[in-house]
Design a protein with these regions (language model features):
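Positively charged n-region of N-terminal signal peptides that target proteins for export
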Residues: 1-4, 111
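Mature catalytic domains of secreted/periplasmic carbohydrate-active enzymes
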Residues: 19-313
Length: 313
């Protein structure tokens, strides 16, 4: 009996070990993708943060890139000086981001009624502001400044209560980091930022909320090895489990993740799952300067959705 029990334990341990995803593209790809994502068809993508206060870009621009406009002195700089004054800084918008009418349960119920199967919340965009109490963003998160609420945590609970999958968008780089300022500091000098900030912060987010979907972004100035893509993807899969899935925005050299065409007609030939990402207008975040005709009508939206689903998305 003792020998049989020992044999069973050995077999069980081997099974557990073999189920672990190793930090190699071969192991990650052997793990594959969960069927639920292919079946889901419709998800909700939420861009809501400090950039939602000015909510401004050119008529065709991305409002969530507001901070970048201040860096390059485009028309957002003139807008800010005209409306808020020359001494007003982007950081001054944070206390104005209050979310006083926000009801996560109401949102989740609406998402459920829409037919969506999963929700993606921008946990941190390129401005570095976090919608959870990240220890790596002191004084620059939604619990310490702004609404004083854990947006990631509250929405995750509400969404899962409705039987939907919860996921997070996470920007790999930041415009505001004091360790490495994206688009300002040399791309190759990103090592310390990745090792001491990005990796521990991303692991903090995943460990705390166990998101089923991880959508990274802002990868394009560095490669997959610099972002430690293999290590992070395998760690994420081993941490969250078999329903977890990542996207493909990990830099040059990435070999895994669902494809993410942006404002496109979709993909017809691919060896991976894919999901087009877009706003109802030309911006993901609210752009008060965007004309109404930029927004898709209900008929246009349904027609576009049918085209994407018919193509396999």
């Amino acid at each position: 009996m003792k020998q049989i029990l020992t044999a069973l334990l050995i077999t069980f341990n081997i099974a557990i070990s073999s189920a672990q995803v190793l930090p190699t593209w071969e192991s990650i790809n052997e793990r594959g993708y969960p069927q639920w994502f292919t079946d889901a068809k419709l998800g909700i993508f939420i861009h809501w943060g400090v950039y939602s206060v000015p909510a401004y870009a050119s008529k065709e621009g991305y409002a969530e890139w507001y901070y970048r406009g201040l860096m390059t002195n485009d028309d957002r700089k003139a807008f800010q000086e005209r409306i808020y004054g020359k001494n007003f800084q982007y950081e001054d918008f944070a206390p104005m981001f209050r979310g006083e009418l926000w009801d996560p349960d109401e949102w989740a119920e609406l998402f459920k009624k829409s037919g969506a199967k999963y929700v993606l919340l921008v946990s941190k965009h390129h401005d570095g502001y976090c919608l959870w109490p990240s220890q790596y963003a002191p004084g620059w998160n939604s619990v310490e400044v702004g609404p004083h609420r854990d947006i990631c945590g509250e929405l995750s609970e509400a969404v899962r209560k409705q039987g939907l999958k919860m996921g997070f968008y996470y920007s790999l780089p930041e415009w505001t980091s004091t360790i490495h300022r994206w688009y300002v500091d040399p791309d190759e000098d990103i090592v310390d930022y990745v090792d001491t900030h990005m990796i521990p912060q991303l692991k903090e987010l995943i460990t705390r909320y166990q998101p089923t979907v991880l959508f990274t972004d802002g990868e394009w100035r560095n490669n997959a090895e610099q972002w430690h893509a293999r290590e992070l993807i395998s760690w994420y899969y081993n941490t969250v489990g078999e329903e977890a899935i990542v996207n493909d925005r990990w830099g040059d050299g990435q070999q895994h993740g669902f494809r993410t065409p942006e404002y496109s007609a979709g993909i017809t030939l691919t060896d991976r799952p894919w999901a087009e990402c877009r706003g109802l207008g030309r911006s993901f975040g609210l752009n008060r300067n965007e004309p109404l005709e930029n927004y898709m009508t209900s008929e246009e939206l349904i027609r576009h959705f049918c085209i994407l689903v018919a193509a396999g998305g």
